[in-house]
From Swiss-Prot:
Biased composition annotated in UniProt, kind: Basic and acidic residues: 170-184
Comp. bias (Acidic residues): 160-169
Lineage: Eukaryota, Metazoa, Chordata, Craniata, Vertebrata
Protein name, UniProt field: Nucleolar protein 4-like
Keyword tRNA-binding: no
Modification Phosphoserine occurs at: S130, S295
Ranges of biased composition (kind: Low complexity): 41-61, 375-396
Disulfide topology: none
């Protein structure tokens, strides 16, 4: 390049310098370099325009360092490198890369004092540039590595709604391995117990979250009663087996899969049969108690309601017999009093005939008239209580609708228990046939 080219390019470079770059050129580091330098070419105004004047170039021609550095004795390339000393600092300010590309190669500096100072400057200024790039690359690697688990969790988020987790596939083996200190035969019986109850009470094609909560709770309570040592894992075992059934159905496998050989044994089958029989007896006992309690509560409510109705009828229709009921000594020798005591449960039903008898003797409160009235009238109305007593036991022998429904539930429970025992017997028989 000619000197005119450097002259035409330098004003553009001078105009592109910002005030912040001027301050950097006036920094203590640059001032220190200006004091050590014998020439006045680097101590200009900082815009690089004065270094291209002929007077300045003539003043620096006597310095032997400049011919060594520039090679051709021209001052302009050295001035360009002097202006380029600010380029590493300008890189921190994120200047366009075109400016950085315009810097000449540093080995062009000679072995003079200015060349050494420029190398020291570039060496010092390049050190703060490398940590941002190295740390930036390290941060980017950290960001990429830390982003990987987040991407995995985001990818697995939709599978949580499926209600079919893949990590439960090997739950049967896990249950067998983590049973330290427990009877393995009882653990096998517990697993088969859960399988039987889930097959009997739950729909295996419906997700476990949509199953009736009362049925699941009933199975858990049954497991807690028969296998108290495994009550903490009952819910998880039910969930695992139900999901495995759903997966097998989705994969096109048979619903009624046989029990794996490593999960069953003759002793476990015996424990299972005993647990099923015990649970059946306890279920029947609970149903009988519920029926008994419901049957006891209902007659009490019916008696209270009937007594209220009869008392209301007596007080509204027959006002005088209310005072005659308080005269108990009058009926001491009469046979009617025995009918009240003999039919204590039917006393409320016999109140209207008694009111009819005492209504005839409301005018004569004396003992003779009452005895005569009682003796004369006792022959006529006596068939009435007997007729009522014979006609009343028919409704009492009938069952209420609630009792009938309770009995039907008991019958259904017996049939279900019988079917369950029948299936257990068939499975035991098949097991014997398989072993033989």
């Amino acid at each position: 390049m000619s000197d005119s080219t450097w002259m035409s390019a330098d004003p553009h470079l001078a105009s592109s310098l910002s005030p912040s770059q001027d301050e950097r050129m006036r920094s203590p580091q640059n001032l220190h370099s200006q004091e050590d330098d014998d020439s006045s070419s680097e101590s200009g105004s900082g815009n690089g325009s004065s270094t291209l004047n002929p007077s300045t170039s003539s003043s620096t021609q006597g310095d032997p360092a400049f011919p060594e550095m520039n090679g051709n004795g021209a001052v302009a390339p050295m001035d360009f490198t002097t202006a380029a000393e600010d380029q590493p600092i300008n890189l921190c300010d994120k200047l366009p890369p075109a400016t950085a590309l315009g810097t000449p190669s540093y080995p062009s500096d000679g072995c003079g004092a200015d060349g050494l100072r420029s190398r020291v400057k570039y060496g010092v200024k390049t050190t703060p540039e490398s940590p941002p790039y190295s740390s930036g690359s390290y941060d980017s690697i950290k960001t990429e590595v830390s982003g990987c688990p987040e991407d995995l969790t985001v990818g697995r988020a939709p599978t949580a709604d499926d209600d079919d987790d893949d990590h439960d596939d090997h739950e049967d083996n896990d249950k067998m391995n983590d049973s330290e200190g427990m009877d393995p035969e009882r653990l096998k019986a517990f697993n088969m117990f859960v399988r039987l109850f889930v097959d009997e009470n739950l729909d295996r094609m419906v997700p476990i979250s949509k199953q009736p909560k009362e049925k699941i709770q009933a199975i858990i309570e049954s497991c807690s009663r028969q296998f108290p040592e495994f009550q903490e894992r009952a819910r998880k075992r039910i969930r695992t087996y139900h999901k495995s059934c759903r997966r097998m159905k989705k994969n096109g496998m048979e619903m009624t899969r046989p029990t794996p050989p490593h999960l069953t044994s003759a002793m476990a089958e015996n424990i299972l049969a005993a647990a099923c029989e015990s649970e059946t007896r306890k279920a029947a006992k609970r149903m009988r108690l519920e029926i008994y309690q419901s049957s006891q509560d209902e007659p009490i409510a019916l008696d209270k309601q009937h007594s209220r109705d009869s008392a209301a009828i007596t007080h509204s229709t027959y006002s005088l017999p209310a005072s005659s009921y308080s005269q108990d000594p009058v009926y001491a020798n009469g046979g009617l009093n025995y009918s009240y005591r003999g039919y204590g449960a039917l006393s409320s039903n016999l109140q209207p005939p008694a009111s009819l008898q005492t209504g005839n003797h409301s005018n004569g409160p004396t003992d003779l008239s009452m005895k005569g009235g009682a003796s004369t009238t006792s022959t006529t109305p006596t068939p009435t209580p007997s007729s009522t007593s014979t006609s009343r036991p028919v409704p009492t022998a009938q069952l209420s609708p609630t009792e009938i429904s309770a009995v039907r539930q008991l019958i259904a429970g017996y049939r279900e228990s019988a079917a369950f025992l029948l299936r257990s017997a068939d499975e035991l028989e098949n097991l014997i046939l398989q072993q033989n």
